[in-house]
Amino acid sequence: MCKKTLLTLTVLALASLTAFAASKDGIVLSKDGRMVTATKPTKSTVQAPSSDAGMVKIYDSIGTAYPKGTYWCCEGATIFGPTAISGEPEYWEAGAFTPTADHTVTKVEVAVGYVEGFNGLVIGLYSDASGVPGKAIKTWSVTNFPQFGSCCAVVAASDSTGISITANTQYWVVVKTGKKSSNTFAAWNVEDVDQVDSELTAFWCSDDKGGSCGSDNDVWVAGQAIPGHAFAVLGSN
């Protein structure tokens, strides 16, 4: 009976996933296309010592206390360019944070893995607009993301001048495609530091060049996620 139940659960779990029918072996999409799983993790390296010493951690869901497990290697939220996968819409992702004091942001770090296409994305710091990402405060075009399914490198975007943010005001870190990344397929890794409390995330979907977003076309949609996206916002007081 136990074996039969386990087999049934396994079949149901596999039924909720769909194999990625392209050149990347071991990459599986959820049925709705929103999540990516790496079933064959790639070679990982321990993250090099960070240059974040002395910086204020305004928000941090990257497990720096555990350099061999700063985030979960093998599952993440889908980021698609408009021509990345035939039959799939364009997807962007965002994670919210609220500073408890006034700060100056000088660095944003994200745990995002590259699957295929152009290895580059846009990272942005955004204001809030009624609970979803609003206007871009600052954006960075970033290339050379680590391979999805590996751990534990992160990608950083810096601003030497600094960006002022206000206490008790919600902001968003956005990872999206740009002009050069129309065929990019990537995934924002889920965090490993808190698997109890939910985090506010949002996705943006566009079916202008294919796929279907239903009633959510070309708008941000927010929701709670457990676990949330792995990212950090650093700076000074």
Predicted regions and their residues:
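Positively charged n-region of N-terminal signal peptides that target proteins for export
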Residues: 1-5
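Bacterial N-terminal signal peptides
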Residues: 9-16
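Sec/Tat signal peptide C-region and signal peptidase I cleavage site
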Residues: 17-21
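Boundary/junction segments of secreted and surface-exposed precursor proteins
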Residues: 22-82
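Short, surface-exposed beta-strand/loop patches at domain edges
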Residues: 55-70, 167-170, 175-237
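Short beta-strands within extracellular/lumenal beta-sheet-rich domains
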Residues: 87-101, 155-159
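Extended extracellular/luminal ectodomain segments enriched in beta-structured repeat modules
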Residues: 100-109, 118
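Aromatic- and Gly/Pro-enriched, solvent-exposed loop/edge beta-strand patches characteristic
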Residues: 114-201, 205
